[in-house]
């Protein structure tokens, strides 16, 4: 959700703070980078390259922080982890604002009028509390159990492919959507409808004009229609009482809003924002993890050996055959290479942007001034690859760099990796609350797929598909098109049956967070 918020913040900071930036740059502020095209150059850069534009500027200038002058406003872009702890310590002056929450509700969900007024004040904290509480302990355990039951049939169906080519990313989207939404929304899950699922993904991939509010009734008519279809389905879901037999998270969010007098339709509109957070990162993360593993035969071999040795338990089935069970608790506790591979995917493929508003003039590390009314952005793509932290291989994928990591993290070369140099889940105190659920789902899929199947790209080479740099919904790079593959069942496990095992109370993953 935070990636959506930064887009909205960029769109509205001009209106909110524009007149304050006509003054000259204070010499203590980060260096001002002038656009190649006066006034609109930076806007054109973001429109063309997405948030990769910040990375391009970082590569060109190599500054720990810099300022961008928009037509009427200024942004501070932080590219070095050195400044992140100082920002965290100034959480009273530099913070994630509640107004950004209401802007997301208005632009993404379409909440308006009285409903928008109700989404202010204490309700923001209450909704966040409901989500955080539901995504740890019993609530997380229940969602994990439901997710496992829903994801296994999708993996079993891959056996029927029999070397027929299929789009790997489309499969990830469909499988993750069904498993995630079944666990979140329960038996009456509205996303089981193919029409609703398709409308959601079409909307999530084409929100630009809606968020920027550029005559959306003309420029984004299809996106508005897609949103309406999802809102109608969610409204019916609540009217029929689907939330009464759903996850603790879904019921908790509904209860907070219902008790505040928010209408069912506006609750449904707010749920679109939540659904984007649930789905838009998990599917591409699953795709890239499978891609990076299968494109590296030696890594694939090592991961298979690790899983078989540490997390797969074999026992006879009722029909006399063999059942192989993957224990997800063992994956968390014993499969450090698989966790490292996943973490490296997040490090290298992150499109996340941390955003903060500055409420008072603030000097960081006794030398850098951030002025009141400014917007701070921290692109994970820059911080996650910082060579002063990650070493000269910071721009390269290395799944082995986390082996033997300590509390802060130590790379294979012994280099200390501080948590603030990993921004894929955001930065404290606003860390992604759903990271443990998403991680469990992704690693369950990846573990079973790589153990059961060999996979080859139709084109013969593992050439990374182009990323859709303009998608606003995902904090992970999303493939811009199809990626066709074929697979076959591994001979050593042919005709074996597979299952998962989940241990309640043991659902948190030891991943780096900022």
Swiss-Prot record:
Glycosylated position list: 144, 245, 416
Cofactor(s) listed: heme
Keyword line: Glycoprotein, Heme, Iron, Membrane, Metal-binding, Monooxygenase, Oxidoreductase, Transmembrane, Transmembrane helix
One Pfam family hit: p450
Pathway of action: Secondary metabolite biosynthesis
A molecular function (GO) term: iron ion binding
Membrane-spanning intervals of the chain: 2-24
Domain of life the protein comes from: Eukaryota
EC number: 1.-.-.-
Primary enzyme class: oxidoreductase
Cellular localization per UniProt: Membrane
UniProt topology in membrane: Single-pass membrane protein
GO cellular component, one term: membrane
Residues annotated as binding heme: 432
Family stated for the protein in its record: Belongs to the cytochrome P450 family.
Name of the protein in question: Cytochrome P450 monooxygenase nodJ
């Amino acid at each position: 959700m935070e990636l959506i918020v930064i887009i909205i913040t960029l769109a509205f900071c001009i209106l909110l703070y524009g007149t304050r930036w006509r003054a000259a740059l204070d010499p203590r502020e980060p260096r001002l980078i002038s656009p190649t095209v006066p006034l609109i150059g930076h806007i054109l850069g973001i429109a063309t390259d997405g948030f990769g534009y910040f990375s391009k500027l970082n590569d060109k200038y190599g500054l720990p922080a810099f300022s961008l002058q928009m037509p009427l406003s200024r942004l501070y872009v932080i590219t070095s982890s050195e400044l992140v702890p100082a920002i965290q310590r100034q959480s009273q002056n530099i913070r994630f604002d509640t107004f950004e929450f209401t802007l997301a509700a208005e632009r993404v969900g379409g909440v308006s009028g009285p409903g928008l007024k109700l989404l202010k004040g204490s309700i923001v904290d209450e909704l966040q509390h409901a989500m955080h509480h539901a995504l740890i302990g019993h609530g997380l355990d229940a969602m994990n159990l439901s997710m496992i039951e829903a994801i296994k049939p999708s993996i079993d169906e891959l056996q029927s492919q029999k070397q027929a080519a299929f789009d790997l990313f489309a499969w990830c989207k469909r499988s993750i959507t069904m498993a995630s939404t079944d666990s979140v929304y329960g038996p009456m899950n509205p996303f089981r409808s193919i029409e609703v699922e398709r409308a959601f993904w079409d909307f999530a991939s084409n929100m630009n004009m809606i968020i920027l509010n550029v005559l959306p009734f003309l420029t984004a008519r299809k996106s508005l229609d897609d949103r309406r279809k999802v809102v109608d389905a969610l409204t019916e879901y609540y009217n029929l009482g689907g939330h009464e037999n759903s996850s603790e998270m879904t019921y908790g969010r509904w209860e907070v809003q219902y008790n505040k007098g928010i209408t069912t339709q506006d609750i449904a509109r707010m749920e679109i924002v939540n659904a984007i957070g649930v789905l838009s990162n998990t599917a591409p993360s699953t795709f890239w993890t499978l891609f990076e593993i299968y494109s590296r035969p030696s890594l694939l071999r090592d991961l298979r050996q690790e899983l078989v040795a540490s997390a797969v338990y074999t026992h006879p089935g009722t029909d006399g055959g063999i059942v192989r069970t993957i224990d997800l608790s063992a994956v968390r506790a014993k499969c450090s290479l698989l966790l490292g591979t996943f973490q490296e995917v997040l490090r290298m493929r992150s499109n996340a942007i941390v955003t903060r508003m500055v409420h008072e003039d603030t000097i960081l590390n006794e030398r850098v001034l951030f002025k009141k009314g400014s917007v701070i952005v921290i692109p994970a793509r820059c911080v996650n690859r910082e060579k002063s932290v990650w070493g000269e291989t910071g721009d390269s994928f290395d799944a082995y760099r986390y082996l033997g990591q300590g509390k802060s993290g130590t790379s294979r070369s012994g280099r200390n990796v501080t948590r603030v140099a990993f921004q894929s889940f955001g930065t404290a105190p606003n860390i992604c609350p759903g990271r443990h659920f998403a991680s469990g789902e992704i690693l369950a899929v990846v573990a079973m797929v790589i153990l059961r199947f060999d996979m080859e790209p139709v084109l013969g080479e593992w050439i990374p598909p182009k990323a859709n740099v303009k998608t606003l919904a995902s904090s992970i790079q999303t493939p811009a098109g199809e990626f066709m593959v074929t697979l076959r069942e591994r001979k050593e496990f042919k005709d074996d049956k597979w299952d998962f095992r989940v241990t309640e109370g043991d659902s948190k993953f030891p991943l780096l967070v900022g």
